[in-house]
């Protein structure tokens, strides 16, 4: 294919991803019966039918994403990501009004819910996706009883599964060192990539050489045997695709067993498929699979085994976020909350105010041992708030949801928003408890021995950038400020502009990448007015968000002159209106930007 194609029209995609209507016969039977046992049985069937409708469409989307990748239909890849991320909620929202209208008393009938849950658990017993169906059931119930602010459990409960065995999703390929190009062909075949290729022989030779270089620190020997474990799945996202696995070297007597992770990144160019990069470093894989990017569509349906494999390849990244990065957000929500509760139970640590700077809009809190930061939005901003008008809690939550639903371009943290979640009062340090109840009256209530959160935001823990710059080695600090510029550019490519360009809104991860993590001040870049400096007469009276690029360095809180110079030298265009206006024009034209999610040094042809 020699040019970008449009395999799917908007109507084609809508038809292919449309959720079937609820089973109206079952709904009618549910509404008509007065027998509590019949009600419970039928309610379970109604919910399971809705879940099955949802699950069928969600499993269809990865194949559509693969087809769009092969057709080079980039707008379709973007639409599929948006469709998939909203599908779960759309399915719940399709059913809830019908149940509320037909059975308004259902929300208060605890006995029917208890019996119906037992019926549902019996119906899903033995199904692979039983835990997902149970999570769907909990979401449905929460939506129906939300007016009562009833807290729910995020435990997987009776639908829990035994630990996943990754052998179910990998193919093992035997090899003899040094790795030969023919082995790379087998690796690509195992993950389901078939071409047409631009230069498969050349790519295979370059990929084999890259793997050999990555193996060198493991002291390999010619003739030594290796096992390559490859996930039998393609992973598709926007303009790219990849396969993942690992290379194992066995105990050699003088050397213990050794292994390295493996990611092979593919592009589909005008003249065919290209192996673009090979990654064999866990931190680099973690960035490629980061929740700061759009989710991957994985063609293998065994999500537990895939998440477990990804966790083994990227152990610094919690298991819960591995589910989210392959599109299973609601299972990720369950796993993340369980991880937080387990961290507390094992460490006995209290949740306390997060290190760094006091938020003017959010209250952030964590445990020293935790991989996560929890947040609520204040009822009113603090006196240090920079802007004249505060849109309020619901508007801020909409911005956090906006970031969740877009391609975060590798530079914005994803966030999980829980509703009506209950946490034991004993989990909280006294000072934090007082602040939450005083500044979050619209969000937090105390019920006996627990706090109930109307909304609770959870993100991966970062080190605030200004704090990081005071403690990092000189080279790491310089790399961070340069990466900050990359972060701002990637945000712009995703049509996101942070009008509060303050370094305190950015953080550094465990793998030393910089991300935006506070979203109360984000706007769509296409709606921002980019202006030169000095302002024109009466320009300060302009409505909307006005941005003067020449002034951006002043707000970033990069105090060290050498670091400011490093930022300016690496990203001079960020201080020029032309750059921002050019990005706005591209976004308005509907262009899908290329976002690099691995180091340029890992590309096979640079």
Swiss-Prot record:
Any Gene Ontology CC annotation: cytoplasm
Intracellular or extracellular location(s): Cytoplasm
InterPro entries linked to this entry: AceK_kinase, AceK_regulatory, Isocitrate_DH_AceK
Domain of life from the UniProt record: Bacteria
Catalytic activity: L-seryl-[isocitrate dehydrogenase] + ATP = O-phospho-L-seryl-[isocitrate dehydrogenase] + ADP + H(+)
NCBIfam families documented for this protein: PRK02946.1 (NF002804)
Protein name: Isocitrate dehydrogenase kinase/phosphatase
Protein's organism: Rhodopseudomonas palustris (strain BisB5)
């Amino acid at each position: 294919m020699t040019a970008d194609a449009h395999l799917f029209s908007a109507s084609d995609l809508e038809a292919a991803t449309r959720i079937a209507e609820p089973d109206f016969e079952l709904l009618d039977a549910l509404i008509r019966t007065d027998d509590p046992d019949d009600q419970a049985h039928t309610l379970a069937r109604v919910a399971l039918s809705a879940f099955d409708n949802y699950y069928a469409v969600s499993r269809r989307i990865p194949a559509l994403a693969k087809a769009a990748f092969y057709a080079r239909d980039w707008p379709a890849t973007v639409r599929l990501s948006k469709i998939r991320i909203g599908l779960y909620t759309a399915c719940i929202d399709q059913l809830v009004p019908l149940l509320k209208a037909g059975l308004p008393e259902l929300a208060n009938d605890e006995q029917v819910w208890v019996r119906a849950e037992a019926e549902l658990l019996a119906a899903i017993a033995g199904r692979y996706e039983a835990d997902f169906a149970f999570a769907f059931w909990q979401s449905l119930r929460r939506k129906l009883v939300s007016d009562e602010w009833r807290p729910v459990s995020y435990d997987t409960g009776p639908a829990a599964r035994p630990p996943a065995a990754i052998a179910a999703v990998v193919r093992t390929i035997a090899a003899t060192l040094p790795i030969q190009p023919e082995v790379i062909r087998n690796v690509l075949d195992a993950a389901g990539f078939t071409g047409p290729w631009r230069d498969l022989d050349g790519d295979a030779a370059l990929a084999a050489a890259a793997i050999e270089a990555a193996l060198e620190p493991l002291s390999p020997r010619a003739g030594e045997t290796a096992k390559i474990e490859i996930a039998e799945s393609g992973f598709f996202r926007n303009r790219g695709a990849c396969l993942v696995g690992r290379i194992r070297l066995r105990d050699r007597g003088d050397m213990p067993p050794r292994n390295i992770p493996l990611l092979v990144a593919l592009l589909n160019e005008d003249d065919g498929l290209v192996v673009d990069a090979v990654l064999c470093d866990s931190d680099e894989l973690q960035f490629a699979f980061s929740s700061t990017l759009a989710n991957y569509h994985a063609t293998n349906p065994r999500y537990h085994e895939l998440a477990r494999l990804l966790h083994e390849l990227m152990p610094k990244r919690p298991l819960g976020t591995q589910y989210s990065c392959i599109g299973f957000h609601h299972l990720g929500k369950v796993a993340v909350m369980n991880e937080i509760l387990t961290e507390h139970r094992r460490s006995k640590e209290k949740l306390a105010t997060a290190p760094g700077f006091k938020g003017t809009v959010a209250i952030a809190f964590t445990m020293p041992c935790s991989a996560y930061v929890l947040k609520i939005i204040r009822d009113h901003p603090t006196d240090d708030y920079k802007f004249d008008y505060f849109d309020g809690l619901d508007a801020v939550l909409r911005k956090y949801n906006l970031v969740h639903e877009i391609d975060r371009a590798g530079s914005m943290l994803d966030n999980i928003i829980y509703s009506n979640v209950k946490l034991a009062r004993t989990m909280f340090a006294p000072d934090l408890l007082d602040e939450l109840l005083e500044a979050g009256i619209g969000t937090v209530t105390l019920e006996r021995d627990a706090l109930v959160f109307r909304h609770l935001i959870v993100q991966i823990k970062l080190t605030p950038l200004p704090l990081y710059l005071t403690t990092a080695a000189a080279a790491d600090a310089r790399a961070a400020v340069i990466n900050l510029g990359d972060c701002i550019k990637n945000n712009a490519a995703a049509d996101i502009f942070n009008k509060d360009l303050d370094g305190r809104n950015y953080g550094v991860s465990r793998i030393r990448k910089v991300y935006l993590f506070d979203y109360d001040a984000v706007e769509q870049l296409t709606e921002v007015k980019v202006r030169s400096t000095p302002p024109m007469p009466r320009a300060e009276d302009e409505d909307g968000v006005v941005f003067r690029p020449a002034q951006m360095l002043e707000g970033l809180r990069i105090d060290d002159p050498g670091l400011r110079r490093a930022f300016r030298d690496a990203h001079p265009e960020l201080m020029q209106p032309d750059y921002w206006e050019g990005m706005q024009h591209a976004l308005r034209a509907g262009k899908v930007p290329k976002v690099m999610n691995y180091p340029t040094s890992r590309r096979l042809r640079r």
